[in-house]
Amino acid sequence: MIKVSNLSFSYNANDEALRNVSLEIPKGSWVSILGHNGSGKSTLSKCLVGLLSPTQGEIHIDDMLLNDLNLPKIRRMIGIVFQNPDNQFVGVTVKHDIAFGLENQCLPHDEMAKKIKHYAELVGMTEFLDKEPHQLSGGPKQRVAIAGALAMEQDILILDEATSMLDPEGTEEIIGLIKRLNKEYGKTIITITHDLSFAAQSDYLIVLKDGQIILEGTPKKVFAEEELLKSSHLELPFGLSLYNELKKDEQVDKNVLEALWAFNSEM
């Protein structure tokens, strides 16, 4: 469980990036935090992992207060993968990059090798272990960055705009991996995004605008507020907008509506 209470953050006196944000993220859920550029969503993600210290409010991870004293413990519980994985790579090869965090744990070499093999297999990167990360295309790069985070065996994983630089094929790869991590491995997943098609597949949505939560709920509940989303510069994909329009017509069969929703929320 992640609990955020009255969180505010300012980069300077005239720039309040977050204002009195309160939210709860249940263990084992997949939550998407939505917002246009400058909404505060990436600032929030950095606060959650302790990269930024809030000017006001508290964050609890599994009932543990995030502060300087608890930060080392918190970082063993929660990891983050940024939009551009090139900014995270530190290893000469994929194998060395996955191993980087493990080396800091002073694990025996054989145990480290097992973990590298396991997480490379999990993200489908076994055949690339001896490749340089920077030689890979977008989707494989993200999978390497995710493998490095998974190797730390944290229960919570934040993906900040993980698909924004990917083509449709790369996006589908990452979505499939997220679903597997969430459903099969019980990871709590937090995705930071402005892509509503992507967010439709998560369990719960939180919408930020100007550093404040303006809307939250299940995808169906949030996407029903189409005008409010538009005011936040978030456009529903055609299929989801069509669903909203057809829902207003009482003559449309409910089974048709449910099929349309299922199709668009699994794209």
What is each model feature region?
Residues 57-65, 74:
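Conserved ABC transporter NBD signature motif
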Residues 49:
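Helix-to-loop junction immediately C-terminal to a conserved catalytic motif
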Residues 132-136, 140:
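Conserved ABC ATPase signature
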Residues 110-128:
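Conserved ABC ATPase "signature" region
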Residues 34-36:
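The feature captures the beta-strand-to-loop junction immediately N-terminal to the Walker
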Residues 157-160:
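Catalytic Walker B motif of ABC-type/P-loop ATPase nucleotide-binding domains
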